[in-house]
């Protein structure tokens, strides 16, 4: 395995995939943000699934994921899109949260020049949503800057319609590597929408990545726990932390022996 930097760096965040929820987008019990390189993660998969392979990692020379300003991605390193919808480092940092938009009726910005860095819909009120996010869980807004925007997708959801939404800036002077929590940030946006618009048709019900009997948002998260938290009118921010913190602590210990850098 020829290793390469993880542009999102070392932070860990999110729920661990539960048994029975394995899919094309979730092969094993790891959190949304695992904080490993491909080489390190491959070694974990070899051990976890007891694969009988001769596995060797060609290590990165001089990679220092804990050093700014680039952290996981050295500033001088050229960005080459791994996908048409992965246009830059800001997207890579936000993606652990914005990927969940694929399981919703909200546009994730496909059909714009900045997909997976923003979200919205024609009927949203972004300033109200940001105010509710600030009221409900202000700590989850750290390490980035949110900006209300309008955009018009040229394809995909809401093609040709003017959408109102929110752009996530996890870059420049706004970016805090340790404090930015994209998975909680996007979860918070869902929660704010549910609190402001209780009957909003948020979850997209369609076949997703070869899964026909499960909601896409649950497939992406490896369980229904996140969706259930969003839809529970009595659930507070601390309730999601109560679900997630043990998974994050366990992964922090579990991955320790696989770190090469």
Spans of features found by a protein language model:
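Conserved functional hotspot residues or short segments at active or partner-binding sites
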Residues: 120-241
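Glycine-rich, charge-decorated loop segments at or immediately adjacent to ligand/cofactor-binding or catalytic sites
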Residues: 1-21
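Sec-exported extracytoplasmic/periplasmic mature domains
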Residues: 10, 46-50, 194, 198, ...
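Flexible, low-complexity junctional segments that flank or bridge functional domains
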Residues: 245, 249-259
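Conserved anion/nucleotide-ligand pocket segment
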Residues: 21-98
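Glycine-rich, aromatic-lined ligand/substrate-binding cores of catalytic
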Residues: 63-158
């Amino acid at each position: 395995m020829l290793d390469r930097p993880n542009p999102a760096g070392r932070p860990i965040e999110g729920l661990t995939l539960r048994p029975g929820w394995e899919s094309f987008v979730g092969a094993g019990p790891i959190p949304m943000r695992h904080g490993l390189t491909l080489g390190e993660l491959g070694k974990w998969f070899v051990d976890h699934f007891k694969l009988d392979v001769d596995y060797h990692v060609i290590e990165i020379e001089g990679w220092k994921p804990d050093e700014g300003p680039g952290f996981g991605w050295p500033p001088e390193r050229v960005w080459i899109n791994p996908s048409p919808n992965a246009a830059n480092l800001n997207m890579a940092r936000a993606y652990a949260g914005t990927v969940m938009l694929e399981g919703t009726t909200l546009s994730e910005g496909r059909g714009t020049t900045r997909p997976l860095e923003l979200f919205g819909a024609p009927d949203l009120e972004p300033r109200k949503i940001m105010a509710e996010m600030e009221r409900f869980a202000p700590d989850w807004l750290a390490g980035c800057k949110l900006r209300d925007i309008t955009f018009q997708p040229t394809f995909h959801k809401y093609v040709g319609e003017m959408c109102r939404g929110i752009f996530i800036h996890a870059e420049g002077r706004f970016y805090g590597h340790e404090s930015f929590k994209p998975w909680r940030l996007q979860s918070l946006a869902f929660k704010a929408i549910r609190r402001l618009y209780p009957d909003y048709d948020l979850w997209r019900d369609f076949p997703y990545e070869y899964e026909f009997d499960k909601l896409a948002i649950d497939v992406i998260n490896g369980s229904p726990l996140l969706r259930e938290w969003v839809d529970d009118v009595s659930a507070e921010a601390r309730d999601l932390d109560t679900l997630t913190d043990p998974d994050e602590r366990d992964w922090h210990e579990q991955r320790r022996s696989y770190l090469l850098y």
